[in-house]
């Protein structure tokens, strides 16, 4: 009703024109207003006239469609050719460029050396002769030389930029001088005059100089530019010009070779070399048949003379990569006399040692080393050249080469000379594979899995190891890593392998790693690892070979830096092979004066092959009780070493030994002690579980003390077990053994005990392991090295032939007189001894007295009284009265010895 009020009031405004019956016509007036709006719209908008049909429009559209179709077809054809060109081998591309340059050289030679007719000849004359002038005859020779270089050295593209810059400077300088020598014709003299001089290049180089400076300064500047180009092309620095000229003169026969004048110096050097030998150095045992000492000496001298020697003022060749000698010199200068072993090098030295290749033939000269401080010398070796890498694989490690036999021997006490075993005693493995058809099939399977589950990810590469291959997967934008880890079972199903391990992410890379076992596994030989360049350059006696990682690189570790190692794995996982590799590595690299060993083998069959080697400080221990006593001796030895370090003011055994060798350690006056360097002491326990079952308290206490304190004393511990449970590898042992090596385990719980993280339960056994060194966040997957029984026997026999073992008698002393402490005493041994001493000395057996004197509670005092009653020290209880004391005061020492488990005095 309220909405109709305005409509009812509008008609009265029109009542002046309509005097009567206006209210009755209100409804028709509204209808008329509604009808007028459509009439106005029809009148306002009229349809536009349609254009007349164009007869040429269809033809135009047809022609346009045909043109676009042809253009797309031609573009697709050329794009296909371009994609095919991208797939060509890089060597074919370089050969194609070289052949193109040869063809161009032939065309230019035909146009410049002969009167070639036709448009090609005119083009050559216009371009080549017009640009190079009188020297156009040398252009085809220059092109041919460049083409031959591309053919002979296709693997050195990094020098192309240098050669282009040098040739440009050389050509510009020479043509500028030719232009000035021919009178410096200008453009007004005509193009023919410029062609008869240095061409357009010579005119462009010489005209600005002659215009601004004149000929007097222009010619020297162009000569300097020419010399600069020549030095750049030949890669010769200015300070090496005399050396290069001397070498060129020697090759041409113009200059006398300075090396021939050193013959007299060789003879004098030979005398010094003979005098440097130890006077008492001789072979142990009878000499082999056919051995001629004088002949061998002359042969060695002739070989030494045949090595290239530098004169005093001769500088090293600057047109070669740095070799190991240069790196060592730079490292020594950077460290300024610091001890390299036992501390990490500076970042400068670390960067300096990266990417070093040795390209020298022969050996470098070394200064004779006194026999008392001689070490096994590792001569330099060649690194194998790296072959071409397939599409998805990473660069394989350099292959190992033969190392020359060690010629230097380490002098021991007296007249004994100990020679290290040769690496020829260890077998050599075959070259490792970098790619196989199985890897390509796995890449295709992974790509199909990602496509089926609509995951934006792609396999960008893989690195093949001896046991597993790690495939690198890069994720697309906004793709969660959890989408890859959730597909673990699907990936295992696709590649038909249950042992799939996913690493998210790969350390140091923005990629997810998928480790899948190889169907064609490879064996890693111990000899291949020890022949590695790093092993040859590092003479530390505690460097041991472990195996080969998933990226194809060899894994070695220094036991002195670990400083203790826990090795664990189920039966058949490769634990025993790892222990054999550790012991064999030490025997091959260290003498008995460098490293002594204590071997504990409760199983009695694993380490018996090493019985009798001179590195042993005691016979192999098979009795668990004697093993506990040996560990106690190691603790005492550690304390004695620390006493010496504290007395003479040294913090590490290496510094103490170095001071002894240099004669810096002085004994007090009147002391009859003879100081000698302490060897490293390596304790290897093959089965920790057996020791923990027999004497858990003594073994754990000794191991904890050794692992906590023995690093600076040069004592290192290797613990191995096939039952890595919490009652064997306790929390105290784990906390003090930072380096772990886990082989295949039977459960996730065992993996967490060893590594504190999962992963070992997914290993496939037979040497497949996870190595977690001290300070690393994630373990490295590796294939453990393998050494055969024949190899071990050969190395052991060589060591036995050198010298007999010298055992110490105090390692397991007292095991027959000493007995175990009674279990009912527990941790109350000290309190029980104090209580017995108090009761016997006072002859008064009262529980309340024990409470007051020992400050213990009633329960503890009553327990001590019961323990003394069971050992016949006091009599039975008589109510509130004091107990009778059954032991006299003069028998107290014997009672205390029995309580402590010692023999009665």
From Swiss-Prot:
GO cellular component: plasma membrane
Membrane topology: Multi-pass membrane protein
PROSITE patterns attached to this UniProt entry: FTSK
Transmembrane segments: 65-85, 96-116, 126-146, 163-183, 216-236
Chain ranges of the FtsK domain: 552-752
One annotated GO biological process: cell division
Compartments reported by the entry: Cell membrane
Domain of life of the organism encoding this protein: Bacteria
InterPro entries according to UniProt: AAA+_ATPase (IPR003593), FtsK/SpoIIIE/SftA (IPR050206), FtsK_alpha (IPR041027), FtsK_dom (IPR002543), Ftsk_gamma (IPR018541), P-loop_NTPase (IPR027417), WH-like_DNA-bd_sf (IPR036388), WH_DNA-bd_sf (IPR036390)
Biased composition (Low complexity): 1-22
Residue ranges of the region described as Disordered: 1-55, 263-321, 372-403
Main location: membrane
Residues in compartment: Cytoplasmic: 237-905
Binding-site residues, ATP: 572-577
MF terms (GO), sorted A to Z: ATP binding; ATP hydrolysis activity; DNA binding
Protein keywords: ATP-binding, Cell cycle, Cell division, Cell membrane, Chromosome partition, DNA-binding, Membrane, Nucleotide-binding, Transmembrane, Transmembrane helix
Basic residues bias spans: 23-48
SUBUNIT field: Homohexamer. Forms a ring that surrounds DNA.
Domain notes: Consists of an N-terminal domain, which is sufficient for the localization to the septal ring and is required for cell division, followed by a linker domain, and a C-terminal domain, which forms the translocation motor involved in chromosome segregation. The C-terminal domain can be further subdivided into alpha, beta and gamma subdomains. The alpha and beta subdomains form the DNA pump, and the gamma subdomain is a regulatory subdomain.
Free-text function comment from the UniProt entry: Essential cell division protein that coordinates cell division and chromosome segregation. The N-terminus is involved in assembly of the cell-division machinery. The C-terminus functions as a DNA motor that moves dsDNA in an ATP-dependent manner towards the dif recombination site, which is located within the replication terminus region. Required for activation of the Xer recombinase, allowing activation of chromosome unlinking by recombination.
Similarity comment: Belongs to the FtsK/SpoIIIE/SftA family.
Official protein name in the record: DNA translocase FtsK
Originating species: Streptomyces avermitilis (strain ATCC 31267 / DSM 46492 / JCM 5070 / NBRC 14893 / NCIMB 12804 / NRRL 8165 / MA-4680)
């Amino acid at each position: 009703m309220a909405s109709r009020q305005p409509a009812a009031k509008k008609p009265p405004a029109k009542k002046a024109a309509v005097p009567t019956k206006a209210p009755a016509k209100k409804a028709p007036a509204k209808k008329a207003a509604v009808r007028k709006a459509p009439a106005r719209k029809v009148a306002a908008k009229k349809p536009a006239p349609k254009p007349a049909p164009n007869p040429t429009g269809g033809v135009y559209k047809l022609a346009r469609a045909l043109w676009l179709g042809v253009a797309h077809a031609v573009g697709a054809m050329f794009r296909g050719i371009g994609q095919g060109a991208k797939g060509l081998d890089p060597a074919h591309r370089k050969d194609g460029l070289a052949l193109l340059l040869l063809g161009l050289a032939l065309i230019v030679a035909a146009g410049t050396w002969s009167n070639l007719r036709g448009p090609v000849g005119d083009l050559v004359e216009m371009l080549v002769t017009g640009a190079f002038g009188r020297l156009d005859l040398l252009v085809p020779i220059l092109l041919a030389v460049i083409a031959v270089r591309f053919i002979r050295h296709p693997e050195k593209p990094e020098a192309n930029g240098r050669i282009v810059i040098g040739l440009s400077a050389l050509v510009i300088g020479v043509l500028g001088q030719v232009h000035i020598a021919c009178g410096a014709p200008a453009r007004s003299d005509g193009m023919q005059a410029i062609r008869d001089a240095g061409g357009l290049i010579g005119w462009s180089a010489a005209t600005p100089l002659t215009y601004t400076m004149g000929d007097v300064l222009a010619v020297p500047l162009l000569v300097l530019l020419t010399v600069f180009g020549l030095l750049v092309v030949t890669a010769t620095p200015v300070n090496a010009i005399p050396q290069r000229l001397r070498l060129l003169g020697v090759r041409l026969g113009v200059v006398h070779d300075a090396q021939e004048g050193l013959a007299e110096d060789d003879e004098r050097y030979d005398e010094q070399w003979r005098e440097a030998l130890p006077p008492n150095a001789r072979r142990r045992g009878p000499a082999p048949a056919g051995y001629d000492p004088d002949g061998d000496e002359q042969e060695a001298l002739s070989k030494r003379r045949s090595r290239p020697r530098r004169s005093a003022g001769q500088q090293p060749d600057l047109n070669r990569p740095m070799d190991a000698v240069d790196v060592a010199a730079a490292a020594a200068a950077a460290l300024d006399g610091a001890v390299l072993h036992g501390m990490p090098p500076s970042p400068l030295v670390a960067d300096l040692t990266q990417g070093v290749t040795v390209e020298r033939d022969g050996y470098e000269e070394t200064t004779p080393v006194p026999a008392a401080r001689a070490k096994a010398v590792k001569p330099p070796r060649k690194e194998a050249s790296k072959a071409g890498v397939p599409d998805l694989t990473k660069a394989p490690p350099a292959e190992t080469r033969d190392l020359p036999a060690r010629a230097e021997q380490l002098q021991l006490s007296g007249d004994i000379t100990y020679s290290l075993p040769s690496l020829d005693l260890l077998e050599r493995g075959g070259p490792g594979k970098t790619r196989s058809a199985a890897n390509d099939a796995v890449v295709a399977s992974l790509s199909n899995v990602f496509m089926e589950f609509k995951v934006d990810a792609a396999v960008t590469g893989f690195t093949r190891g001896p046991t597993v291959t790690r495939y690198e997967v890069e994720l697309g934008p906004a793709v969660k890593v959890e989408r890859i880890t959730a597909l673990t079972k699907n990936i295992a199903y696709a590649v038909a392998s249950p042992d799939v391990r996913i690493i998210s992410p790969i350390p140091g890379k923005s990629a997810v790693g998928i480790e899948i076992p190889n169907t064609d596994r490879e064996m890693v030989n111990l000899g291949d690892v020890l022949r590695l360049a790093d092993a040859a350059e590092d003479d530390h006696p505690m460097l041991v070979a472990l195996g080969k990682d998933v990226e194809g690189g060899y894994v070695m570790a220094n036991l002195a830096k670990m400083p203790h190692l826990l090795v664990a794995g189920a039966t058949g996982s490769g634990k025993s092979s790892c222990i054999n590799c550790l012991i064999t590595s030490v025997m091959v690299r260290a003498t008995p004066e460098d490293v002594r060993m204590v071997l504990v083998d409760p199983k009695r069959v694993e380490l018996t092959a090493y019985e009798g080697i001179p590195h042993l400080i005691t016979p192999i221990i098979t009795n668990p009780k004697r093993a506990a006593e040996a560990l106690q001796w190691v603790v005492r030895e550690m304390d004695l070493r620390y006493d010496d370090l504290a007395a003479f003011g040294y913090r590490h055994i290496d510094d103490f030994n170095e001071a002894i060798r240099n004669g810096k350690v002085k004994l007090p006056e009147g002391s009859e002690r003879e100081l000698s360097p302490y060897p490293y002491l390596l304790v290897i326990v093959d089965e920790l579980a057996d020791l923990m079952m027999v004497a858990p308290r003594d073994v754990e206490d000794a191991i904890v003390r050794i692992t906590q304190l023995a690093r600076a004393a040069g004592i290192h511990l290797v613990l191995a077990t096939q039952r890595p449970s919490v009652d064997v590898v306790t929390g105290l042992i784990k906390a003090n053994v930072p380096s772990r090596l886990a082989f295949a385990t039977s459960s996730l719980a065992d993996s967490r005990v060893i590594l504190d993280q999962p992963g070992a339960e997914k290993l496939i056994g037979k040497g497949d392991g996870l190595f977690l060194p001290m300070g690393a966040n994630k373990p490295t997957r590796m294939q453990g090295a393998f050494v055969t029984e024949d190899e071990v026997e050969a190395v052991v026999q060589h060591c036995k032939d050198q010298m007999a073992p010298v055992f110490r008698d105090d390692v397991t002393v007292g095991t027959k007189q000493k007995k175990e402490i009674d279990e009912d005493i527990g941790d109350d041994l000290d309190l029980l001894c104090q209580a017995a001493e108090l009761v016997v000395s006072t002859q008064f057996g009262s529980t309340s007295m024990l409470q007051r004197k020992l400050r213990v509670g009633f329960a503890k005092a009553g327990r001590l009284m019961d323990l003394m009653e069971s050992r016949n020290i006091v009599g039975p209880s008589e109510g509130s009265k004091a107990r009778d004391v059954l032991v006299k005061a003069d028998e107290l020492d014997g009672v205390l010895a029995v309580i402590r488990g010692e023999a009665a005095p």
